Swiss-Prot record:
Family, per entry: Belongs to the peptidase S1 family.
Function per UniProt: Plays a role in male fertility. May have a role in sperm migration or binding to zona-intact eggs. Involved in the activation of the proacrosin/acrosin system.
Species in which this protein is naturally found: Homo sapiens
Location relative to the cell: Cytoplasmic vesicle, Secretory vesicle, Acrosome; Secreted
PANTHER family: INACTIVE SERINE PROTEASE 37-RELATED (PTHR24271:SF61), KALLIKREIN-RELATED (PTHR24271)
UniProt disease annotation: Patients with unexplained male infertility (UMI) show a decrease in the number of sperm cells compared to fertile men. Sperm exhibit also abnormal activation of the proacrosin/acrosin system and premature proteolysis of ADAM2.
Signal sequence interval, chain numbering: 1-19
Matches recorded under Pfam families: Trypsin (PF00089)
Gene: PRSS37
Protein name (record): Probable inactive serine protease 37
Cellular component annotations (GO), alphabetically ordered: acrosomal vesicle; extracellular space; nucleus
Length: 235
């Protein structure tokens, strides 16, 4: 089902004032977590590992990589089953904190121009830094249930103090906040907000309890790098 929203109401869905102009943005690290429930987006961080929000732990999960367009095949398409899913130890469905999980793929993804891992952040990002937000949307000709179009936009990172003053940010720990400065609208399918990439490194990933407004709240990946690296060790 598709709805009309505004960027200030639901962050992370990507659309244009002129819906006749659509293009595929480069975001080869994005993977689509396909299930019988709501769509979710993850990030390939190693050929065998995907980082995703823990609330995306869904039945019959399949990981889709490469080209997502069902009517156009280009040889980059891959669908891989998970063999292990590890949620962050402190995650709870009742709170927005620690909303991370790692997915180990049954076999390594085959890397190509549309399938590439993304490096994890090594430092906290400075407030005011303009970062890239990546997500998935529905192309104009797609009337199906699953998104098929990678989309990017830019937004500045807020300071922790600014974030804590907002309705969305005050209840989040280990968060990263961005300020949306443009509002466009068109009909689109609801999809997860996905990622924040700063200086070509994964800095933030969506949380599951978005509250609306013009501020996007993300889990600060840098705060969890030790857990991610220890869990996703290639044996």
């Amino acid at each position: 089902m598709k709805y009309v929203f505004y960027l200030g109401v639901l962050a992370g869905t990507f659309f244009f004032a002129d819906s006749s102009v659509q293009k595929e943005d480069p975001a080869p690290y994005l993977v689509y977590l396909k299930s019988h429930f709501n769509p979710c987006v993850g990030v390939l961080i190693k050929p065998s590992w995907v980082l995703a929000p823990a609330h995306c732990y869904l039945p019959n999960l399949k990981v889709m990589l490469g080209n997502f367009k069902s009517r156009v095949r280009d040889g980059t398409e891959q669908t891989i089953n998970p063999i292990q899913i590890v949620r962050y130890w402190n995650y709870s469905h009742s709170a927005p904190q620690d909303d991370l999980m790692l997915i180990k793929l049954a076999k390594p993804a085959m890397l190509n121009p549309k399938v590439q891992p993304l490096t994890l952040a090594t430092t906290n990002v400075r407030p005011g830094t303009v970062c890239l937000l990546s997500g998935l949307d529905w192309s104009q000709e797609n009337s199906g249930r699953h998104p098929d179009l990678r989309q990017n936009l830019e937004a500045p990172v807020m300071s922790d103090r600014e974030c804590q003053k907002t309705e969305q940010g005050k209840s989040h720990r280990n968060s990263l906040c961005v300020k949306f400065v443009k509002v466009f609208s068109r009909i689109f399918g609801e999809v997860a907000v996905a990622t924040v990439i700063c200086k070509d490194k994964l800095q933030g990933i969506e949380v599951g309890h978005f509250m609306g407004g013009d501020v996007g709240i993300y889990t600060n990946v840098y705060k969890y790098v030790s857990w991610i690296e220890n869990t996703a060790k290639d044996k």
